[in-house]
Swiss-Prot record:
GO terms for cellular component: glutamyl-tRNA(Gln) amidotransferase complex; mitochondrion. GO terms for molecular function: ATP binding; glutaminyl-tRNA synthase (glutamine-hydrolyzing) activity. Allows the formation of correctly charged Gln-tRNA(Gln) through the transamidation of misacylated Glu-tRNA(Gln) in the mitochondria. The reaction takes place in the presence of glutamine and ATP through an activated gamma-phospho-Glu-tRNA(Gln). This is Glutamyl-tRNA(Gln) amidotransferase subunit B, mitochondrial. It is an enzyme of class 6 (ligase). Belongs to the GatB/GatE family. GatB subfamily. GO terms for biological process: glutaminyl-tRNAGln biosynthesis via transamidation; mitochondrial translation. Its EC number is 6.3.5.-. Residues 1-21 form a transit peptide.
């Protein structure tokens, strides 16, 4: 079987790490009942990767003891003033440029007023009126193996990118009937990215979030650890029949993973369609995604618009960014011109390079690039000094063999401690015909169990006799024995039933525990059966 055929046969559902964010059924706007159409817009809060907070020198540390990372200004002690963190501005500009946004030469901060116990000032500092950047476009591939037949590209416009501070965290104790407040998160720097409602399915929304994660990680502007709350996604969803006005939207919050983005949106679309088909009404409300029950739950009504009483922040001057002309030196100047020259290669550029340089399929390029660890292994194996390896063999091995073993063991790629050098050694053994795909998986399974300090693949194969039988004399004797033991099968083959040849080859594979060289085995069987 060819590598491409093996790739097609073994392609499995692939997610934010190596498992898919696919829902059970393919999301297809054309297939919605009664010609319903869905409209989806995302709001993403990304925690800026900075050592200190947006307006104070307090440390940003996930998992720190309660209230251990709080400056006086974070607790809104009277007499304290905010001081803008330059690093956060630079990373915000860097992100805006990567998304094709137009960076504003002058932006401003506002106060957004609302009352929560974990917001001691009674307002949040944000950029509502004059954000750091506007416009922009994010184009991304939508491809879920086993769900979408072929990848296609979708684009979502970026409405604006703004800087803002996070609130603290309230901890409710229903037994003691008390609420406790942790201000470690208060003042943590955030970028809010608001996308236009250009999406139609949950899969498209999940693909957008995945692409955004790849971009932010490459830029170094956000860790994107959703399990730590470093990236939070809110989805605005509405449905309407074709050729009718847009429906009433709901906002779904608390979406904590890429896979949950697709699940939450598809659930909410189905819920709204059911309500409208039953003659009901959709309310403009905020709903929470329950990952355990896999459904959205009403939180609060938005029918009455809340007045946040936005006003200019009097304690912060306008933010000036140098956006055109020659690079402007100086510690007090953030230069978008200079930042643009330092942008890394973005994921889509990497995919195009893989397809054009290594002649891999777009599907393979998407799977390789969509996982940072997988792409790192691919590059390490190909770029090893003094070695020339086939990109197709390397890609197929990583996708079909490594990911299959990890998926079988429910191990994430980041938790896999097999070194790239060991993976490269298995590729070499495949290319030199010392092992086949079956033996490669046995070796991978053993290497996974042994971990980083385990034996090399060559040692594992030698100790367990997991090397292919390539000796022609030995294979010929096996062929003769099988032919002699199966006279009826031989007779059928000689009468024109060519498939019987593979029945004989299958017997040899069983006898040798899949270690016989099948190409040589088939050749020898054909030659012996002609006599």
């Amino acid at each position: 079987m060819s590598w491409n055929a093996l790739f097609r046969r073994n392609l499995f559902i692939f997610n934010f790490r190596h498992r898919s964010f696919a829902t059970k059924k393919a999301a297809n706007p054309v297939a919605r009942p009664n010609r319903w159409r869905s409209v989806i817009g995302l709001e993403v809060h990304a925690q800026i990767q900075s050592e200190s907070k947006l307006f104070s020198g307090a440390e940003v540390s996930f998992g720190a003891p309660i209230n251990a990372c709080v400056a006086l200004v974070d607790a809104s002690i009277p007499g304290t003033l905010p001081v803008l963190n330059r690093r956060c501005v630079e990373l915000g500009v860097r992100t805006a440029l990567a998304l094709g946004c137009e960076v504003a030469p002058v932006s401003a901060f506002d106060r957004k007023h609302y009352f929560y116990a974990d917001l001691p000032a009674g307002y949040q500092i944000t950029q509502q009126r004059a954000p750091l950047a506007r416009g922009g476009l994010l184009t991304f591939p939508v491809f879920v193996p086993g769900v979408t037949k072929k990848p296609y590209y979708k684009s979502a416009r970026v409405h604006q990118l703004q800087l803002e501070q996070d609130s603290g965290k309230s901890l409710h104790d229903p037994v003691e009937r008390k609420s406790l407040v942790d201000l470690n998160r208060a003042g943590v720097p955030l970028m809010e990215l608001v996308f236009e409602p250009d999406l139609e399915t949950g899969e498209e929304a999940a693909a957008l979030v995945k692409e955004l994660i790849l971009i932010l990680t490459r830029l170094g502007s956000c860790s994107c650890r959703m399990e730590e709350g470093a990236l939070r996604v809110d989805a605005n969803i509405s449905v309407h029949r074709e050729n009718t006005p847009l429906g009433t939207r709901t906002e779904v919050k608390n979406i904590g993973s890429v896979r949950a983005v697709a699940q939450a949106i598809e659930y909410e679309i189905a819920r709204q369609i059911d309500v409208l088909d039953g003659g009901g009404r959709i309310f403009n409300e905020t709903r929470n995604w329950d990952a355990v029950e896999r459904k959205t739950i009403a939180m609060r009504d938005k029918e009455v618009v809340q007045d946040y009483r936005f006003m200019p922040e009097p304690n912060l001057p306008p933010l000036h960014v140098h956006v055109e002309g020659d690079y402007c030196e100086g510690d007090d100047v953030v230069s978008a011109v200079k930042i643009r020259t330092d942008l890394p290669e973005l994921p889509e550029e990497t995919r195009k390079s893989i397809v054009e340089t290594h002649h891999l399929t777009p599907e393979m390029a998407i799977i390789l690039v969509n996982d940072i660890t997988l792409h790192s292994h691919f590059r390490s194996i190909l770029d090893e000094p003094g070695k020339t390896r086939s990109p197709k063999v390397v890609a197929n091995f990583l996708i079909n063999e490594l990911l299959t073993i990890l998926n079988k063991n429910k191990v994430d790629l980041e938790e896999c401690h097999i070194p790239s050098s060991h993976l490269a050694e298995i590729v070499d053994m495949l290319e030199t015909n010392r092992i086949n795909q079956y033996l490669a998986r046995l070796i991978l399974q053993e290497a996974l169990e042994q971990g980083a300090s385990g034996q090399s693949p060559s040692q594992i194969a030698a100790d367990r006799d997991w090397l292919m039988i390539t000796d022609e004399a030995k294979i010929e004797q096996l062929c003769r024995d099988v032919i002699q033991r199966n006279p009826k099968v031989v007779e059928k083959y000689r009468s024109g039933k060519d498939k019987m040849l593979y029945a004989l080859a299958g017997d040899i594979a069983k006898l040798t525990e899949q270690k016989a060289d099948m190409a040589r085995t088939v050749e020898l069987l054909k030659r012996l059966l002609k006599k």
